[in-house]
Amino acid sequence: IGLLFSVVLGGLIVTTLNASNKSHFIKLALAFSGGFLLAILFEHLLPELYESKGTSVGLYILSGFLIQLLLEYFSGGIEHGHVHVHKGQAMPWTLFLSLSIHSIIEGIPLGNHYTGIIAHHAHESHESLFWGIIFHQVPVAIALMTLLLSTSLSKAKAWIVLGLFACMTPLGVCFGLAVTPEQIGLNFQMILGVVLGMFLHISTTIIFETSENHKFNF
């Protein structure tokens, strides 16, 4: 419910606040989410991942970092709150697909937790990951809803698309519940490492980014 509500909250912020207040809120939400993600990464998630004594943890984290970099090539950086609006533009389905893949991947470790796969991990680690996703989803939903309302979609259809996006992380959780990493030739350390690498890329980009007109160029 929390995963769904965080996205709905982002949509409500866009539709209720005026442009000035919305811009101010986005900046504050981004700064908080970036700082919160970095804090839980270095205080809980990364130390506990390395305690698992996996031999390739660093490689998994780097893979997640690079996967996020590739996804942002198609999404334009909306994962860290950046949206480039052109009034009346067509619905950017490539961006939506990229953002959906990101959300599904980050939900998988939560599902694995509930199956008991990581019962040996501290409960605080799971809670940190959950709240990290929650606080990350709000500014992403704000940016996505802002973009949707600038397209040729009606307001009702924009809410439908946002609702579809809201279902993506729970879909990842369901996948993690139904399929163990070993069933697809992976392990939990690999999946969590990839997710943490993605979070590391997003949080550092939020913290160190200074240009409001930032975009990724390849």
Task: Report residues per predicted region.
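Intrinsically disordered, metal-sensing/regulatory segments
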Residues: I1-F218
